[in-house]
Amino acid sequence: MEPLGLVVHGKAEPFSAALRSLVNNPRYSDVCFVVGQERQEVFAHRCLLACRCNFFQRLLGTEPGPGVPSPVVLSTVPTEAFLAVLEFLYTNSVKLYRHSVLEVLTAAVEYGLEELRELCLQFVVKVLDVDLVCEALQVAVTFGLGQLQERCVAFIEAHSQEALRTRGFLELSAAALLPLLRSDKLCVDEAELVRAARSWARVGAAVLERPVAEVAAPVVKELRLALLAPAELSALEEQNRQEPLIPVEQIVEAWKCHALRRGDEARGAPCRRRRGTLPREHHRFLDLSFK
């Protein structure tokens, strides 16, 4: 009886280095991608991509015809991110950078590369900062990455004022902004949050070529106007006449809370203080303080 064989392993580093040398190497390549808005050519090897990734197996499933095959156009993925994907597929390792990791994460999700996705998520959590967090939140909401969304919301809750001043905040979708405005733990006063929401809506209105109030409609209902002092509410009402942002009915409800001096009349959240809410004289009448 023939004895059982034994699998022995050589050194992984030379093998990985040899495969890494094939990334975007036209020598022996049999497929060319045209990548990103810059339409940069990237060279690869069909058999390797197909055996490592179902997305490429489907994309490259048909045999190339005679002659020079046509390039495969992938216009939505940035070149740097695509090269990182190839590096991972060839070597099962990848060098990630803070400035491009969200693009690599997006590609990993779209191509169904779960291991690369997890590596990117771990890296994002390690490098998360004020400038990156809103962009990361947008990616998390777009692709349903629940744990990353929770991490981002918690980070913004702790660094609210700084995060609200970033470009990433102004570029959030309404769906990504909603979990922030619903949070009791934001370390920011409501007056500043109203100003941030207005700035966000103005940017969206300019990009989408729609009225500010229309852009703001999905999110402004989460603003807790009853927390504002009467003078602040009057000023907001006047500004709202000049540049509509908040439905008149919502402002009326805030005035009702002042008139009745009972927080429960606002039915919960509209009168509930956030962690960063500055104290005002009328808050002593509100039943629902921050917990």
From Swiss-Prot:
Disulphide-bridged cysteine pairs: none
InterPro entries: BACK (IPR011705), BTB/POZ_dom (IPR000210), BTBD19 (IPR042846), SKP1/BTB/POZ_sf (IPR011333)
Family matches, as Pfam families: BACK (PF07707), BTB (PF00651)
Coiled-coil region list: none
Domain BACK: 134-234
Domain of life: Eukaryota
Domain BTB: 29-98
Name of this chain's protein: BTB/POZ domain-containing protein 19
Source taxonomy: Eukaryota, Metazoa, Chordata, Craniata, Vertebrata
Gene that this sequence comes from: BTBD19
